[in-house]
Amino acid sequence: MRTTFMAKATDVERKWLLIDAEGKTLGRLSSEVASLLRGKHKPTFTPHVDCGDHVILINVEKIVLTGNKLDKKVYYRHSGHPGGLKQTVARDLLANKPERMLELAIKGMLPKGSLGRQMFNKLHVYAGDTHKQEAQQPEVYELRG
């Protein structure tokens, strides 16, 4: 009888992946990056262990939203004080903080809890085409779709 393989946190080998987000759709890119951060592309995937790779996203300001989402999609945040609800349209968020838009989309696709926060820390998002992780020698990753 065979037993199910369960990876240990010490045995996980992590790679650094570089993804160019130019011209990619927000949701399709986010779901694939979330899968890479979880480690679901590896045959040794274990749900209760952080098996994912580090992901570097560049050219995030050139991301695409389909339909009328640039004008209709609204992002909310709250200061914690009464009447402190702020809202921002996707067009303004993309112009001012394009990294935040992708971070919010990916964070919502990761598990909620300490393991999800640990996975989210392996995400590195940059608006331009330069990044600070040249020393890690990331390999270019081509998306499936």
Swiss-Prot record:
Signal peptide: none annotated. One of its GO terms (molecular function) is mRNA binding. GO terms for biological process: negative regulation of translation; translation. It comes from the Bacteria. GO terms for cellular component: cytosolic large ribosomal subunit. The keyword Ribonucleoprotein applies. Gene3D superfamilies: Ribosomal protein L13 (3.90.1180.10). Part of the 50S ribosomal subunit. Belongs to the universal ribosomal protein uL13 family. This protein is one of the early assembly proteins of the 50S ribosomal subunit, although it is not seen to bind rRNA by itself. It is important during the early stages of 50S assembly. This is Large ribosomal subunit protein uL13. It comes from Exiguobacterium sibiricum (strain DSM 17290 / CCUG 55495 / CIP 109462 / JCM 13490 / 255-15).
